[in-house]
């Protein structure tokens, strides 16, 4: 599944394999507070795919709103980074880069930790 629009990138991650998705977004600090359940699920699925992780990488099982996992704070910082990159796209990249390519996957490429470039 490819995400075409991540409303404000990166907080928690995807559906639990064992049992569904939180009904409502709680403790949303970076994503829009009025995000729909469907858009939140789509966004979380996108994060999971782009980083190759499951929900529990950032979330406490069945308590998505908790901030007990360090990766959740990291995720919020990374969402802000992507938001900034999108806001300053022309400054960073010029007209040749479309906003749609500025995602978590741009650097992570399916891995929780981006691999450094080695020439």
Name what the model sees in each region.
Residues 8-18:
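Bacterial N-terminal signal peptides
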Residues 21-119:
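Sequence context surrounding c-type heme c attachment/ligation sites in exported
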Residues 1-6:
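Positively charged n-region of N-terminal signal peptides that target proteins for export
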């Amino acid at each position: 599944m490819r995400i075409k629009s991540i409303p404000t990138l990166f907080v928690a991650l995807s559906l639990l394999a064992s049992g569904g998705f939180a009904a409502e977004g709680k403790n949303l600090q970076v994503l829009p507070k009025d995000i729909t359940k469907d858009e939140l699920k789509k966004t979380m699925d996108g994060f999971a795919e782009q980083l190759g992780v499951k929900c529990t990488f950032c979330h406490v099982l069945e308590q998505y709103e908790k901030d007990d996992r360090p990766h959740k704070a990291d995720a919020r910082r990374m969402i802000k980074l992507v938001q900034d990159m999108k806001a300053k796209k022309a400054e960073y990249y010029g007209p040749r880069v479309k906003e749609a390519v500025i995602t978590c996957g741009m650097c992570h490429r399916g891995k929780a930790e981006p691999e450094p470039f080695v020439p």
